[in-house]
């Protein structure tokens, strides 16, 4: 699954266009490397997202094309 779609489906970022912009700005790292929105995300990957001065680090646990709001938190875990 593409990185921008995973971020939207998991609700780490609300909109896919915002996820694209964050990737273009270099604020998202996958396994420690700057990532484009088109990078394929796999189970076990570590994603770091920089929101201003705050950094969120998560590990991908599951990948689904769609999910309910209550189940979105099961797609990742905070590190």
Question: What is each residue range found by the language model?
Answer:
Residues 1-41:
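A basic, amphipathic helix-loop patch mediating RNA/tRNA/ribosome contacts
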Residues 53-79:
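C-terminal structural segments of small proteins and small subunits
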């Amino acid at each position: 699954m593409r990185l921008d779609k995973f971020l939207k489906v998991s609700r780490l970022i609300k909109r896919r266009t915002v996820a694209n912009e964050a990737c273009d700005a270099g604020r998202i790292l996958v396994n420690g490397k700057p990532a484009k929105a088109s990078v394929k995300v796999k189970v076990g990957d570590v994603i770091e997202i920089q929101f201003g001065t705050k950094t969120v680090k998560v590990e991908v646990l599951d990948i689904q094309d769609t999910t309910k709001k209550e189940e979105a938190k099961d797609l990742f875990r905070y590190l």
